[in-house]
Amino acid sequence: MSSPGISDESIKGPKDVRLIHLILSSLGVPSYSQTVPLQLLTFAHRYTQQLIQDSQVYAEHSRGQNAPISVEDVRLAVASQINHSFTGPPPKEFLLELAMERNRKPLPQIQPSYGFRLPPEKYCLTQPNWIVSNETQQNQPKEENSSDSRMEEDKLDFSVKSE
């Protein structure tokens, strides 16, 4: 993190990076990541490049091919960038008007029941739809020492409920 009170000699790097550090410290920014000056330089480079390209287009349109860029071309490019890229928030009155229009429509009434409405239970898939019955246990008395316990398990009847 960088701190305020940075002198020009204490910052290592290109002149532009030192300039960004000095601007941030003069604005009273107490601390920032070391990537912030690089991001600001990238933004400034892209913005300047776009202004020069737009100025060149305006110069070629007004004075022909390979015309030099004039101050008026740069001013026009800056004005178009400000109108296009840097838009402010809408006016407060406009937002209040939109809010009043939206709030005119009443909210739906709250139903006496809460949650999701489910269909009747017989149509819901939340209930089991099968019955397990063991015919051998119902018809015969239990044997305590049965060696064929697996055979009895195989006789379980899985039938589907019919309603």
Curated annotation (Swiss-Prot):
Gene Ontology biological-process entries = RNA polymerase II preinitiation complex assembly; transcription initiation at RNA polymerase II promoter; transcription initiation-coupled chromatin remodeling
Give the Pfam families listed for this entry.
TFIID-31kDa
Q: Which GO terms describe its molecular function?
A: protein heterodimerization activity; RNA polymerase II general transcription initiation factor activity; transcription coactivator activity
Record's GO cellular component terms: cytosol; nucleus; SAGA complex; transcription factor TFIID complex
Among Gene3D superfamilies, the record links this protein to:
Histone, subunit A
Q: Where is this region: Disordered?
A: 131-163
- Phosphoserine PTM positions: 159
| Keywords attached to this entry | Nucleus, Phosphoprotein, Transcription, Transcription regulation
Provide ranges: composition bias, Polar residues: 131-140
Question: What are the boundaries of the signal sequence?
Answer: none
Fetch the InterPro entries from UniProt: Histone-fold, TFIID-31, TFIID_subunit_9
Ranges of biased composition (kind: Basic and acidic residues): 141-163
Keyword Zinc present in the record's keywords: the answer is no
Biological function: Functions as a component of both the DNA-binding general transcription initiation factor complex TFIID and the transcription coactivator SAGA complex. Binding of TFIID to a promoter (with or without TATA element) is the initial step in pre-initiation complex (PIC) formation.
Quaternary structure annotation from Swiss-Prot or TrEMBL: Component of the 1.8 MDa SAGA (Spt-Ada-Gcn5 acetyltransferase) complex, which is composed of 19 subunits tra1, spt7, taf5, ngg1/ada3, sgf73, spt20, spt8, taf12, taf6, hfi1/ada1, ubp8, gcn5, ada2, spt3, sgf29, taf10, taf9, sgf11 and sus1.
Report the family membership: Belongs to the TAF9 family.
Q: By what name is this protein known?
A: SAGA complex/transcription factor TFIID complex subunit Taf9
